[in-house]
Amino acid sequence: MSPSRALSPLSRALLLACLGGPVLVSAGSACAAEIRTDARQYYRLPAEPLEQALNHLGRQAGVLIAFSPEQTAARRSQALDGEYTLEEALAALLAGSGLEARARGDGAYTLEALPVEDPANLQALTVVGDWLADASAADVFEHPGARDVVRREQFQAQGAASTREVLERIPGVSAPLNNGTGSHDLALNFGIRGLNPRLASRSTVLMDGIPVPFAPYGQPQLSLAPVSIGNMDAVDVVRGGGAVRYGPQNVGGIVNFVTRAIPEDFATKLDVHSELSPSSSQDGLKTTHNVLIGGTGANGLGGALLYSGTRGGDWREHSDTRIDDLILKGRFQPSDEHAFSAMTQYYDGEADMPGGLSAAAYRDDPYQSTRPYDKFWGRRTLASASYEYTPNASQKLNVTGFFTKTLRSGYLDQGRNLTLSPREYWVRGLETRFSQGFELGESRHEVGIGHRYVNEASHELRYWTRADSGQLPSTGSRNDRDTRGSTEANAFYIDDRIDIGNWTITPGIRYEKIDSEQKNLLKNSKDSGRYNASLPALNAIYHLTPSWNLYANTEGSFGTVQYSQMGKAVQSGDIEPEKARTWELGSRYDDGILRAELGAFLINFDNQYESNQQTDSVTARGKTRHKGIEAAIAYDLADLDPLLSGFDVYASYAYVDASIREDGPNKGNQVPFSSKHKGTLGANYRTGAWSYNLDGSFQTSQYADNANTESESVDGSTGRIAGWMVWSARGTYDFGPQLNDLKLGLGVKNLFDRRYYTRSFDDNNKGLYVGQPRTLYVQASVGF
């Protein structure tokens, strides 16, 4: 690999136009130019996350230290207690991190990666094993496809109170307002690259590698998404280059929620986030509390308790929400070779659903609710255990078992009837992965093989009463649905990561074999099917420099035949899964000052099924094509002029052309709920203990139906959805270690109170849904 060359300010400015992530700058209150870096000073800093340590050192020394969150993520510093020069203190904090501090003049410093030897000259061969891993900056940079990781510090800086708000800001991802039967905070709606966002059914969604959907094969939807952003350290979105390792619903990529890590030293961390929308129907604060308690002993045994709880409603009437999410994690590493880990989760919540509004009701009061009966509740229990064996640097074995039990239920006004729909799901899984590294001539290989077995069972019921009776149904009411589903699925993969010169090439294939059935106990009938999918892939990276690479990939991906779609597939006489072929080409640059990425993609998606909740039917949309460009950039302006120290800017943009390609009246139309243009832009400023953030996001218009209906219907379910742009602002103060790292923040979302909306088209509670109005929020966090 060729040596790294520092780019001039002019070169970086040119790259700004075409190729992203925020840069943090720790700054002291004194003028940096007046600081003597060779003078010895007493420093006392605890062992803590590297980002916090650099912030505290910068404040004590009165210097500027610029770095990106990715550089410090998942890294800790040793404690300092004594007299050091600034150079010595920086070296001590960065020991073992793979980073070094470079003086840039006027007392300012930036962090840069230590030089990496040419792979051909490396003596040690180290396997990666799990591609998702801890989503470190190095993992992301070396990934052969589009991938973004949003870390806890970033979504706190954005004022994000939900997973939807975090996902909505990632290039190529659309996470619309809660709507339809997912119009509550327990659900999650998002789509990647123009795929329908309804209940996130087109992507593989994981939490620490464990499937999040209550039935990942038979019902891969997130009407109950047991993931609280307060319990997460990062959100890892792999839009391309991951379908060989992860599935099944991988047409829309892989999203992995990374839970908060077990601290190395015993720690207690508390934080709170409260919101209020004064101009809406909200009658009180909506508040989320988060807690982490845990640590690791000298014997390698560690544990942590995570809790996130939400109470309150949002800007719509009839939106009260209660969520309790408790996670217990444990890890025992008696030696470098052996590591054991386990996790349990209990998630329980309930929420009123405000529902959609007709056009007339929306004009009268967009914050009202006309559906007093709609309500959703659910709970999930998860248990997982994992064993990792690493006998040497070139071998790694991981075995993970998991079990989930889920209940999701709710009342829904379906016009003539009020319904109660309790549904239970049980999932058992066992996954084994093995990686072996070896050398062959001038090339280095890491061969990975894996197998996952999943067994699912479901029981879905629906009870009803007449709507004009005004009585809610119970389990003693008449029922019109009683089905039991089951699935056995085996997935196998093999790939070979080959490093030769500046190239990294990874061919691989995933094979899925699925046996699924659904029994209708009311009709005494059964629909069943056996099918399989072979998904070959080829990924490649070319390293121009240690800071700049090119990547390309092509991969097969697929979506399962869900329980609700099995009857339609059997009737057609051809039980085939949804299939897609994805192509990507892009470039990524990251030198610690400038982060930039530019990529293009093409997805040809065939044999799609589409469910309509209003008519309780399944139709075939058939073929769609998704093509576009994604770009992101972040830049530390101190690189242009020291007077701009503390400022960084960022932007992202996605152009997505998603069109229906199936022959018929809708051929050539835009896929519903996909915007052609979407992006973000903003700036951060840090001075001393103060931090300020200004952020904007925008998207262009969408359609709600396949016909691309322009005019608005009376019920509000169809018609063009207008584009919008909103701005947010935030300010925080860090009181430092003398007050247990107390941080206080105040922010406002939708700063200019822009009115925007979305629609629900094929749900029973269809109609118009108003967007979040101007909302004030406060944040506080403290650690012990």
Language model features by range: what are they?
Residues 54, 112-156, 164, 390:
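Short, acidic, small-residue-rich periplasmic hinge/interaction motif at the N-terminus
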Residues 112, 139, 144, 164, ...:
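Extracytoplasmic beta-strand/coil segments of soluble accessory domains associated
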Residues 210-239:
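Short acidic/polar hinge/loop motifs at secondary-structure boundaries
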Residues 282-311, 315-353, 375-388, 441, ...:
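Transmembrane beta-barrel wall of Gram-negative outer-membrane proteins
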Residues 291-293, 386-390, 396-412, 543, ...:
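Membrane-embedded beta-barrel scaffold of Gram-negative outer-membrane proteins
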Residues 294-296, 447, 552, 638, ...:
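Conserved C-terminal beta-signal and adjacent last beta-strands/turns
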Residues 333-347, 377-521:
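Face-selective signature of the C-terminal outer-membrane beta-barrel domain
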Residues 434-436, 440-441, 447, 505, ...:
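Gram-negative outer-membrane beta-barrel transporters
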